[in-house]
A protein has these predicted regions:
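Glycine-rich phosphate-binding loop of ATP-grasp-fold ATP-dependent ligases
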Residues: 19, 146-151, 175-180
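Short, well-ordered coil/turn elements that cap or connect secondary structure elements
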Residues: 32-34, 113, 141-144, 171-172
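ATP-grasp fold ATP-binding core
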Residues: 139-140, 168-180
Length: 180
């Protein structure tokens, strides 16, 4: 029996187009004899289900061309002729979203709340890793090797960009890696 996989991609991040490529790669390489894949596109906090044979239909995304789906108690539904109809119940969600809610624990939390197993770190690990300053602090406290780092908050950078750059040049050696 094939396991049902919700292939979740899209999102609010600037990287949502990359997630479509990720989803297409998963679809190309997944063992279709073992897994039945159902694409689920995320846009502006909403789910949309579509045809697995045409994932490219989601780029550029036009919500008026797709039916909104609702995740209720671990099952995806959509409205048909005014009635809520079950689309599918995934056994697992393959998370392909990049950045933002796809990596910061939000989507992972939605899956956990709905009792759906998923590919990814858990909620806490995802949230911690998304915050680079927090991650470095935790890793340092565990005596793990961490490159020297400094933090410039966005508000401070916007107030005095040149001053922030000069300060970083003075306290760090090149090459410098910048993580927003």
């Amino acid at each position: 029996m094939q396991r049902k996989v919700a292939l979740i991609f899209g999102g609010r991040s600037l990287e949502k187009e990359i997630s479509i490529i990720t989803a297409m790669q998963v679809l190309k390489n997944i063992d279709k004899s073992k897994f039945k894949v159902e694409p689920v596109y995320v846009d502006d906090g909403n789910f949309y289900v579509g045809d697995v044979d045409d994932i490219k239909q989601f780029t550029p995304f036009n919500p008026s061309l797709h039916e909104k789906a609702y995740l209720i108690n671990g099952e995806f539904f959509k409205f048909k002729r005014g009635k809520l109809v079950k689309v599918f119940k995934p056994d697992v969600a393959f998370l392909c979203c990049h950045g933002g809610e796809g990596e910061n624990g939000t989507l992972q939390g939605i899956m956990e709340f709905n009792g759906i197993a998923y590919t990814s770190c858990g909620v806490l690990a995802s949230a911690c890793c998304m915050d680079k300053v927090f991650s470095k602090s935790v890793f340092s406290s565990l005596l793990l090797n961490v490159l020297p780092y400094e933090t410039v908050m966005k508000a401070d950078f916007e107030k005095d960009r040149q001053g922030a750059v000069e300060w970083l040049k003075a306290v760090l050696d090149y090459p410098i890696i910048v993580k927003p």
